[in-house]
Amino acid sequence: MSTSPLSVVILAAGKGTRMYSDLPKVLHPLAGKPMVQHVIDSALTLGARQVHLVYGHGGDLLKAHLSGQPLNWVLQAQQLGTGHAMQQAAPDFSDDEDILMLYGDVPLISAATLQRLIAAKPQGGIGLLTVKLDDPSGYGRIVRHHDRVVGIVEHKDASEAQRRINEINTGILVANGVDLKRWLARLDNNNAQGEFYITDIIAMAHQEGRQIAAVHPERLSEVEGVNNRLQLSALERAYQQQQAQRLLLAGVMLTDPARFDLRGELVHGRDVVIDTNVIIEGKVTLGNRVHIGSGCVLKDCQIADDSVISPYTVIEGARLAQACTVGPFARLRPGACLDAEAHVGNFVEMKKAHLGRGSKAGHLSYLGDAEIGAGVNIGAGTITCNYDGANKHQTVIGDDVFVGSDSQLVAPVTVGRGATIAAGTTVTKNVGDGELVLSRVKQVQLSGWERPVKKK
């Protein structure tokens, strides 16, 4: 078992021609984040002291998307094979560290599998991740002698006998820095592809009497790469299936696990129920007995115990206290905050707005930059007019206020505790405690009036 410090090399120089995209292949998202970010996260989970990212095509885009990551950027100007890519990073290797080689387009490799691989690496030898396939066509074959790994032969260079081998190379390996640099310096491109194969170091290690330990991943999907969108979609489904199984086993009821997408992190309590076609992004926290209806999208939000989110509601950057009810077809934008037992109904939008305990906004309203007290009724069609064309302004509504339907509150404005706003009122001035305010046009009734008749 190796106790050396660890650095990681991630190969990400490929163009991804078969993706038919202007975006570098490794930046295509899986579960809401770039494929290569999944690999970086696994590397950092292992405690890597340095992560070298070998890049080529789309370097500017890669650096823009990954600007906040602790990476050592290594340019591979020409893509001449995996061995060539590692040669570009080799000057940065320390003699006393282990080097783990990963791929930016193999996104589901788990930290647990990599930890087993690192632990299995013999002193002075190589840890190699391999897998057995029913159809190994196109992959490098693992060559063994008396059950010991002695080499890897690429498919195009393999003999007929070697092509019958079903154990294949995943490309993921770990070796000590001083050994790896020596082997990389001896690589040549005398093969059918005219490339420098990293796999040639296996035979070199065997010739030196070094041991090669083969380890298998927990799941085949961990070592499956992406060359086209079909493969990417298959890995997306594999990932989502894993997440759904994990949540079900942890007590979350997913009505249909095949129709659930987790694109971030879900923290949950007991007896949570999530209906079909729900998407969770960022970090979402659901308390005990929370029910999420079909078709909801939740992003970076907190929903406390006994709350019910009805179908087709979108919640982002919001906080909901206990026993809130929201939706259907509601939208809570960043900064929305609901106190306990508050209700937001269909076609209501909130942004940077606080709705007090037991307050209700049942229908067809916009509440933006608003501070709303407890026990308030917001009538259908109420609008807080928060934008004057240049700046946003706040509306403050005290406790126990009744706002009639089709009212507009032109901010900045304050409505005092217990006030009543009559239906159809436009509030432009502050309203005192307990006051009634109404600004309707006087009703006029004309007897004997007839509608115009269309001219023929």
Swiss-Prot record:
Its pathway is: Nucleotide-sugar biosynthesis; UDP-N-acetyl-alpha-D-glucosamine biosynthesis; N-acetyl-alpha-D-glucosamine 1-phosphate from alpha-D-glucosamine 6-phosphate (route II): step 2/2; Nucleotide-sugar biosynthesis; UDP-N-acetyl-alpha-D-glucosamine biosynthesis; UDP-N-acetyl-alpha-D-glucosamine from N-acetyl-alpha-D-glucosamine 1-phosphate: step 1/1; Bacterial outer membrane biogenesis; LPS lipid A biosynthesis
Q: Which amino acid positions bind acetyl-CoA, per UniProt?
A: A380, N386, Y387, S405, A423, R440
Where is the major localization of this protein? Answer: cytoplasm
EC main class here is: transferase
Q: Does the keyword Membrane apply?
A: no
Q: Where in the cell is it found?
A: Cytoplasm
Q: Which residues does UniProt mark as catalytic?
A: H363
Matching entries from InterPro entries are given as:
Bifunctional_GlmU, GlmU-like, GlmU_C_LbH, Hexapep, Hexapep_transf_CS, MobA-like_NTP_Trfase, Nucleotide-diphossugar_trans, Trimer_LpxA-like_sf
Where do the annotations place UDP-N-acetyl-alpha-D-glucosamine binding? 11-14, 25, 76, 81-82, 103-105, 140, 154, 169, 227, 333, 351, 366, 377
Q: Which GO terms describe its molecular function?
A: glucosamine-1-phosphate N-acetyltransferase activity; magnesium ion binding; UDP-N-acetylglucosamine diphosphorylase activity
Residue stretches in coiled coil: none
Q: Which terms under GO biological process does the entry name?
A: cell morphogenesis; cell wall organization; lipid A biosynthetic process; peptidoglycan biosynthetic process; regulation of cell shape; UDP-N-acetylglucosamine biosynthetic process
Give the note describing cofactor binding and stoichiometry. Answer: Binds 1 Mg(2+) ion per subunit.
Positions of the UniProt region annotated as Pyrophosphorylase: 1-229
What segment(s) does the record annotate as region Linker?
Answer: 230-250
Segment N-acetyltransferase: which positions? 251-456
- E.C. number: 2.7.7.23, 2.3.1.157
Catalytic activity, as annotated: alpha-D-glucosamine 1-phosphate + acetyl-CoA = N-acetyl-alpha-D-glucosamine 1-phosphate + CoA + H(+); N-acetyl-alpha-D-glucosamine 1-phosphate + UTP + H(+) = UDP-N-acetyl-alpha-D-glucosamine + diphosphate
Quaternary state and interactors: Homotrimer.
Q: Which family does it belong to?
A: In the N-terminal section; belongs to the N-acetylglucosamine-1-phosphate uridyltransferase family.
Biological role? Catalyzes the last two sequential reactions in the de novo biosynthetic pathway for UDP-N-acetylglucosamine (UDP-GlcNAc). The C-terminal domain catalyzes the transfer of acetyl group from acetyl coenzyme A to glucosamine-1-phosphate (GlcN-1-P) to produce N-acetylglucosamine-1-phosphate (GlcNAc-1-P), which is converted into UDP-GlcNAc by the transfer of uridine 5-monophosphate (from uridine 5-triphosphate), a reaction catalyzed by the N-terminal domain.
Q: HAMAP family, per this entry?
A: GlmU (MF_01631)
Q: Which protein, by its recorded name, is this?
A: Bifunctional protein GlmU
